[in-house]
Amino acid sequence: MRLILGLVLAVILSSATAAAAEPKLVWEVKGLSQPESVVHDPATDVLYVSNINGAIMQKDGNGFIARLKPDGTILERQWVKGLNSPTGLALRDRTLYVADVDELVEIDAASGSISKRHKAKGAIFLNDVAVAEDGTVYASDTPMNTIWRLKDGTFEPWLANDDLNGPNGLLVQGDKLIVASFGRMPGEGQKQELAGLLAVSLEDQTIEPVGKGEPVGNLDGLEPLAPGVYLVTDWAGGALYRIDSKGKADQLINLNQGSADLTYFPETNTVLIPMMLDNTLAAYRLSEPAPQTKKKTK
């Protein structure tokens, strides 16, 4: 009898633990227009969210940046106007960098005014942006398998290689540029390939898979969770993954298609995910203990 009671108790505790392990939706804000990327500005404690607001990759002038409180309250829906199809965002000092079709746009975060536009001649779709500690800016051109670089005022292709496999999300870590690949663009009648994480040497541009390099999905957003561990969204599959240095992927959240370029708050173990096709921004509190990691300069 004691054994049976012990087994029953174990099952109950196991079920309770499993239930507690589910990430919790904290809030969800509606009223956005194809939100693609979100970053946090620690100086003003606000969120910036890029909104495509039209056809992807079209130069229609409809794109904008929204400004929100960290709880999802919209402060200014169209804080910055006059963009085309804005996607990836990165904040360095008081400059907000925006990937906008074939331009890298600089916005003064203090005033919300556009200060510079760097033309990427020959680019098709600049997708994500990341900034290194020295201020060098990297931008991915997904369909062209190219990484662009802004350094000392010059914006030019830095690495063009088909092994990038549709580079999307970017993250600078030490002497490596971590790349979340979307997969090669399919031809007519072909199925979209799945892809994984890559590590590119900033010194010699060597491309290596993260871990075994097994394909995970059509990857988009990329954030550090712990040393060698990443939070990654699958845009097409609709999921949030935890991928470690061996390339092992664990799905944390099942989402709708369109889960895009996220940001992560280690202090509260909360992840913010733009749901591009749902026109929402969703905040989830993860279940596992928040590790101590340096938040990336996105």
Q: In which residue ranges do the predicted regions lie?
A:
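Bacterial N-terminal signal peptides
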Residues: 6-15
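Asp-box/WD-like beta-propeller blade repeats and closely related beta-sheet repeat scaffolds
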Residues: 23-26, 103-144
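A short beta-strand motif characteristic of beta-propeller blades
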Residues: 24-29, 73-80, 113-119, 154-160, ...
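Beta-rich, blade/repeat-based domains predominating
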Residues: 32-44, 55, 61-62, 80-96, ...
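Short glycine/acidic-enriched loop and turn motifs that connect beta-strands
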Residues: 53-57, 103, 144-145, 184-188, ...
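A short loop-to-beta-strand structural motif that recurs across blades of beta-propeller domains
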Residues: 61-66, 103-105, 146-149, 196-198, ...
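Short loop/turn segments that connect beta-strands within beta-propeller blades
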Residues: 68-73, 108-113, 150-154, 201-205, ...
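Blade-level signature of beta-propeller repeat domains, shared across WD40, Kelch, NHL, RCC1
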Residues: 259-297
